[in-house]
Amino acid sequence: CITEIESSKGTKLLIDLGHNLPDGESIAHDLYDEKSNIETLLDGVSHIFYSHYHSDHIGFESKVPDKIQQHIGSLSLKMIRNLREHMTYADSLKEEAYKSLSALERFDEYESNKRKVYGDISITTLPVSHSAIDAHMFFIECDGKTILHTGDFRDNGYNGKEMFEEIKSYISQSIDILITEGTLLSRNNPKMITEYQLKEKAEQLLNKYKYAFVLCSSMDADRLCSFFKASHDRDTKRR
């Protein structure tokens, strides 16, 4: 995921600089693994804003020259730094992980609901609900136009309803350009359950079986909360 925003005066920003995700068991290959390609992409760029810490949104941070300022949310920075530190234990990933950790030391941490100006482009960072905690969308003002870049989002998380109300409030301001994700566009009638429903199902299974083993992302805070609350509520009802 990479979006380029350039003003008529030449200010150029990127929203996300991610790597392709693996397809099943295969190794992920990306156009920007080639040094010449990423150098061409970054030519003239002054700032890069990351919406969240998933690898298809941040994956080339170590390849970015020091003169380009990289920005991410404070909690997202902690999460990606923790992930890269764990990668240093794998011999095949160690070298790149240390390069990434060095780059992360130079990151700027943006705050939610803050508007800042970079050259002649302004960006307001707005929190959204996603499986990555501290995910953000961006309200961008450039050349008299307004752009809403939603990043990845969902409405079935714990803060989904509030997030959609926020999006509606910005769309009501006559957005000129909407840039959004399309994760579910290729799926026919996807059946999604909410975190509340998942928590209830988990509690039922915990009541049914003596032992339960959970397999989920350790970086999905909503999901961890769902299983914690299911276990807590199950134990509370047994007292």
Task: Go through each PLM region and give its residues.
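His/Asp/Glu-rich metal-coordinating catalytic cores
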Residues: 1-47, 56-222, 226, 232-233
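A contiguous, basic/glycine-rich beta-loop/short-helix subdomain that forms a polymer-engagement track
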Residues: 239
